[in-house]
Regions:
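Sensor-1/coupling segment of RecA-like P-loop NTPase cores
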Residues: 1-28
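C-terminal leucine-rich, beta-strand-based interaction scaffolds used for sensing/assembly
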Residues: 3, 114-117, 122-190
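Short glycine-/polar-rich loops that comprise or flank the Walker A/P-loop
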Residues: 6-8, 33-36
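Small/polar loops that bind or transfer phosphate-bearing groups
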Residues: 11-12, 40, 181
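Conserved nucleotide-binding/hydrolysis micro-motifs of P-loop NTPases
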Residues: 15-19, 43-45, 185
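Conserved AAA+ ATPase "SRH/arginine-finger" region at the nucleotide-binding site
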Residues: 36-47
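Amphipathic alpha-helical "lid/sensor" segments that cap RecA-like P-loop NTPase cores
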Residues: 49, 53-115, 173-175
Length: 190
């Protein structure tokens, strides 16, 4: 049906990245090879800063470039988190400085403490360990002997836990490194 509609483009989007990927890359799925994937990358830092700075200035407030850069790096340019933190900074400070950033992120993470505790409690002990290993190793070299020995976990147990977390879409993998999809949850785990 979609193939027969003229002059209409379709956009498939959502938060279930692996389901969307499978729709177009699994040869048994009906949309196999029928779309061009487009990954939305973080907003470039300079452009994002110009936007945020303008919004602060409109209300007579300031945010330094140094503080914005620190925020952007801490949250890996994740748009919703940058905006959320900036909103709270704007609410609480006339002039945002670098030293305001980390405490504000911790405060925001603490607001979700009950949710994150409940979520974390639903994971098996091995999955909890896997999440902590991801955080402590920045997602890289998780299956190295050093990491396995340091965390007293077998390779098969860690691989199994990682696969479950991937299936649940709690984590994802890119360039041979794992990362936690919810950056604020990752910061809460720290």
């Amino acid at each position: 049906y979609i193939q027969n509609i003229d002059n209409i483009g379709f956009v498939f989007s959502g938060s279930k990245k692996h389901l969307l990927t499978q729709m177009f890359t699994n040869y048994v799925k009906p949309f196999y090879a029928q779309a061009t994937p487009l990954e939305l990358l973080p907003i470039p830092k300079e452009r994002f800063y110009a936007f945020v700075k303008e919004k602060f200035e409109i209300s007579g407030k300031t945010i330094t470039k140094e503080s914005f850069d620190a925020l952007y790096e801490l949250v890996d340019g994740e748009s919703w988190l940058v905006q959320n933190v900036c909103y709270h900074l704007w609410q609480n400070f006339e002039n945002v400085e670098k030293e305001h950033i980390e405490p504000m992120i911790k405060e925001i993470a603490a607001m979700s403490d009950a949710i994150y505790k409940m979520m974390f409690d639903n994971f098996s002990n091995t999955q909890k360990s896997a999440l902590k290993i991801i955080v402590n190793n920045k997602g890289a070299n998780l299956l190295s002997k050093d990491v396995l020995n340091l965390n007293d976990i077998s390779k098969s147990s860690l691989v199994s836990a990682l696969n479950v977390l991937l299936d649940k879409e709690v984590i994802d993998k890119s360039d041979n490194a794992y990362y936690i999809n919810d950056k604020l949850f990752e910061m809460w785990l720290k």
